[in-house]
């Protein structure tokens, strides 16, 4: 209440909170023992869990991932597909469809994140360089049709030829645009933002960093209202960097990812 945690008793019926108040007669009581009860987490950028790689995950594998995530408080996730062959990406999408359409016990798969293939080779990270492309909006349309509208997020490098022209079309397809894996200048990144990009993908990793004479894509992310993906594992970004991001962007613009 008003940004503060309260000591309350919650009445839950069929998995939904009915009200906060006195315990009804005959109700089962679960004592949280002082722990905080919060809404389920949403992991917007994840590539797998418990030994399962999203790029090779069957619907059954995705249930393994979803069960693990739910056990640790994550109730929804987007599956992030690394740049792969068209054949393998299509296979992944079909398996995602199968998982989403079947009864499941674990976290809900709320969308697909295409991390590529429109990424800069110089900042490719783990992406296979020979599969990277400049632009191909028809390919994205094909994937989105196959996914039945399930592609919710894509990461692009703004400096690649033709990528800026793709952004409005991607928005029309219902896809959130993130910028990353990029050596974009400040001006290129700001143009991408003006055209509709709304997320900085794992900011500070696989990205051209700030210089006082060229703030680059990093500076554009920090200055703008973009959401700032932040890998909070203590390795990709040290704790001091995460604290700096939080102060620069404000907590409402930080997206903690795994």
Ranges and model annotations:
Residues 10, 15, 34, 45, ...:
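Divalent metal-coordination and catalytic microenvironments
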Residues 47, 63-95, 107-120, 147-159, ...:
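Divalent metal-dependent hydrolysis catalytic cores, especially in the metallo-beta-lactamase
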Residues 41, 48-57, 78-88, 206-223:
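Active-site loop-to-helix "anion-binding N-cap" substructures in soluble metabolic enzymes
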Residues 114, 121-137, 141-216:
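Divalent metal-binding pocket/active-site signature
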Residues 166, 188-258:
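Active-site-adjacent C-terminal substructures of enzyme catalytic domains
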Residues 1-38:
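Histidine-rich, glycine-flanked metal-binding segment
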Residues 58-61, 92-95, 136-138, 212-218:
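Charged helix-capping and loop-helix junction motifs
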């Amino acid at each position: 209440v008003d940004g503060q945690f309260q000591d309350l008793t919650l009445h839950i019926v069929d998995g939904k909170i009915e009200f906060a108040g006195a315990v009804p007669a005959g109700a089962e009581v679960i004592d949280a023992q002082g722990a905080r009860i919060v809404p389920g987490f949403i992991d917007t950028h994840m590539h797998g869990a418990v030994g399962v790689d999203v790029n090779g995950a069957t619907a059954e594998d995705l249930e393994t991932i979803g069960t693990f995530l739910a056990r640790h408080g994550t109730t929804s996730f987007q599956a992030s597909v690394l740049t792969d062959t068209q054949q393998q990406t299509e296979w992944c999408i079909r398996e995602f469809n199968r998982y989403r359409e079947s009864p499941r016990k674990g976290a809900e798969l709320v969308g697909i994140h295409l991390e590529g293939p429109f990424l800069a080779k110089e900042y490719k990270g783990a992406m296979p360089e020979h599969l990277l492309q400049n632009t191909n909006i028809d390919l994205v349309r094909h994937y989105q049709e196959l996914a039945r509208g399930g592609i919710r997020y894509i990461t692009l490098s703004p400096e690649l030829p033709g990528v800026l022209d793709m952004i409005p079309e991607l928005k029309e397809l219902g896809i959130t645009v993130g910028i990353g894996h990029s050596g974009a200048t400040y001006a290129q990144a700001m143009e991408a933002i003006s055209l509709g990009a709304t997320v900085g993908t794992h900011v500070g990793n696989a990205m051209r960093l700030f210089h006082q004479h060229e703030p680059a894509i990093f500076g554009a992310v920090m200055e703008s209202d973009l959401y700032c993906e932040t890998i909070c594992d203590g390795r990709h970004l040290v704790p001091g960097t995460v604290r700096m991001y939080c102060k620069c962007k404000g907590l409402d613009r930080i997206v903690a990812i795994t």
